Amino acid sequence: YLAAVRDAEVALPEEISRELPAIVSAAKPDCEQQQWITLGDSTELVMVTSMMTGKRAESFPDTTECFTMNQGKLWVTLPYDLEEHFRRRLPTCNDSTECRMRLVQLLGLPPTCNYDCLLIFYADAKSIIRPTPDNETTDHEAELCFPDAATAEYREWFEKNVQSSYHSNFPYPWTRLGYTYDWNCDTPSHIGPGEFIVKKGATVKIARKVDCWTWYKELSTKK
């Protein structure tokens, strides 16, 4: 894991993926698996998923209504993208422990984290960014440098996250290239699913809360 952190700290041009999933609009989904809903005021929400503890998942209200997410920002992936990457890397799981740890690795999370649940929800697409120097979500690759349009606020957040990711007591292999770092030593590629951030204050709607093992068992029955 620490080797992954050191590797991720240096982002190289050859590490750029040109196949990142994009978030554009309900009228122009990136693929047929991408799920959207449109509210009465024309706000468009796309389905995303975030791994967390079951306790934190339960802190989100059990409601079928939309609400404003005030719990802070969430790092997320797109459900179908997570499923595709997981199935390619681990076609079969022996038990819940193996399943959970493989998800932790795939998402670039520390081995000591106790996440065991997936929160699947819809989020306002306009409140989602890609955690890269150019943070738009509508294309399929990231840039290595900030565009002129990058705000001072975003640049400051980005640089602070660089410091906390690589130079703190709790480091993360943040790629800054729009995908997670899969740190499993036997993985054919360290390029994980595309990652995004849902900002605090976003309009969201909970789809479901599911433990990792149940998620995998359901995934294993899909064709």
What do these predicted ranges mean?
Residues 77-80, 122-124:
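Short His-Asn-centered micro-motif
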Residues 72, 98, 113-116:
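Short, well-structured alpha-helical interface segments that form or flank functional binding sites
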Residues 98-104:
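A Trp-anchored, charged/polar loop motif used as the substrate-binding/catalytic surface
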Residues 1-77:
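ADP-ribose/NAD+-binding catalytic cleft of ART/PARP-like enzymes
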Residues 53, 81-84, 126-129:
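Solvent-exposed loop/turn segments at secondary-structure junctions
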Residues 60, 89-92, 133-136:
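Surface-exposed beta-strand edges and their flanking turn/coil or helix-capping segments
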Residues 80-98:
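Short active-site loop/helix that positions an aromatic residue
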Residues 104-223:
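Conserved NAD+-utilizing ADP-ribose enzyme module
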